[in-house]
């Protein structure tokens, strides 16, 4: 959470917030996605998104400049081939792109941080390591959680 706020404030220095917690539980209905969706207060909910399609890299880059928290819900659905793209996006500090019908490029700061959820424990497939993902096994007490 500190890294996310530092990213928003532009305090990350030369590095972007490139670590994403992955909430993991083999049981469905543990409110992992619900928990992610309420991390931001109501006033900032328009900066939260849980639709992140890696097939359009330019669309992904635009979301990095528009949203504060991107939930990669059901993280295990992302293919091994998409992981290289995702890792690259996670380390970007600034975004350079050309808007439609413009002849020049614009630079925008990246404000987005990532979080993810999965019902699979064996979801990191990179044989060289996965330093960008911090898997956290959760056992959320649904009854207590729903009181929030």
Which residues fall in each region the model found?
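P-loop NTPase catalytic core of nucleic-acid-dependent motor ATPases
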Residues: 2-65
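Conserved nucleotide-state-sensing and coupling region of NTP-binding domains
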Residues: 20, 76, 103-106
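Conserved AAA+/SF3 P-loop NTPase catalytic/coupling segment centered on the Walker-B
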Residues: 67-91, 124-129
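Conserved catalytic/switch belt of AAA+ P-loop NTPases
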Residues: 83-106
């Amino acid at each position: 959470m500190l890294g996310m706020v530092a990213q928003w404030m532009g305090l990350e220095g030369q590095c972007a917030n490139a670590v994403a917690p992955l909430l993991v539980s083999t049981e469905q209905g543990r409110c992992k996605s619900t928990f992610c969706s309420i991390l931001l207060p109501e006033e900032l909910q328009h900066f939260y998104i849980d639709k992140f399609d890696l097939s359009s890299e330019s669309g992904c880059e635009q979301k990095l400049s528009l949203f504060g928290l991107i939930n990669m819900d059901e993280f295990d659905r992302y293919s091994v081939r998409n992981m290289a793209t995702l890792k690259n996006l996670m380390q970007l500090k600034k975004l350079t792109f050309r808007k439609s019908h413009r002849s020049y490029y614009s630079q925008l700061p990246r404000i987005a941080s990532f979080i993810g959820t999965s019902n699979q424990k064996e979801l990191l497939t990179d044989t060289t390591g996965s330093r960008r993902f911090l898997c956290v096994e959760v056992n959320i007490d649904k009854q207590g959680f729903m009181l929030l």
